[in-house]
Each structure stands twice: as C-alpha cells, then as structure tokens.
Amino acid sequence: MSQAQYAGTGRRKNAVARVRLVPGTGKITVNKKDVEEYIPHADLRLVINQPFAVTSTVGSYDVFVNVIGGGYAGQSGAIRHGIARALLQVDPDFRDSLKRAGLLTRDSRKVERKKPGLKKARKASQFSKR
C-alpha cells in the first residue's frame, strides 16, 4: 500500500528543484538534510513555506527536495515554485489562491551577462572628455 505522492519542478535563477510531496507531518528535507541545516537563513525558510501558508496546508505534507545550482536565495525560490506546482496536483482548486499570490509564475530574472569593453554587465570605466 503506497501513499499518494505529488511531484513538481521549480526553477529560479540558476537553481532547479525537484519536489515530492507526501502526506505527513510537515517535515522538509532538502538534499537529504533537514531544511534548518541546509538553509541557514530564517527568512529564506519562510519563503519555502509560503505555498503552504497560502493554501492553509501547513503541516499536512512531508516535502522531499532535490535541488541543484544557484545559491541559497535561488534555491529557496526554486523550492517554493516546485512546492506550489506540486500542490496544484494535490487539489486543482488551489490554483486561484496560488496564482493570486504569484507563486505559480516562474521568476524569469537571471544574471545579465558581462559585455565586452565594459567592467561588468553595465558598469563602464570612467568617461574622460579630454
């Protein structure tokens, strides 16, 4: 007798998170570590829990995440996106509240590339008229 599993893939910046939701107690495991151990910043852990807060399902599902690429902020955003997509599979009625909170939209902002002749993406060396 296997439990129902719900999957979702989330992306943010260079991070990609594959998320599985299993009915349980609300335990979040990221790359086989506890979320408090893997993500040290409390504000980023709040970001991860946003989809549950919006849908009033806090503590209803255990979350297993495999995330690669990016840093803490990008990975947290990717996990949030993946959880929101997985919650859609749990109950399609969540779509309206998740969409209104902006959790289903892929944040397309990425690091702008460095241009030749400039020091960074937009920073130029100081201009001298004479």
Swiss-Prot record:
Biological processes per GO annotation: translation
Residue ranges with Basic residues bias: 111-130
Keywords on record: Ribonucleoprotein, Ribosomal protein
Residue ranges of the region described as Disordered: 106-130
GO terms for MF: RNA binding; structural constituent of ribosome
InterPro entries xrefs: Ribosomal_Su5_D2-typ_SF, Ribosomal_uS9, Ribosomal_uS9_bac/plastid, Ribosomal_uS9_CS, Ribsml_uS5_D2-typ_fold_subgr
Family: Belongs to the universal ribosomal protein uS9 family.
The protein's name in its UniProt record: Small ribosomal subunit protein uS9
Source organism per UniProt: Streptococcus pneumoniae serotype 4 (strain ATCC BAA-334 / TIGR4)
Lineage, highest ranks first: Bacteria, Bacillati, Bacillota, Bacilli, Lactobacillales
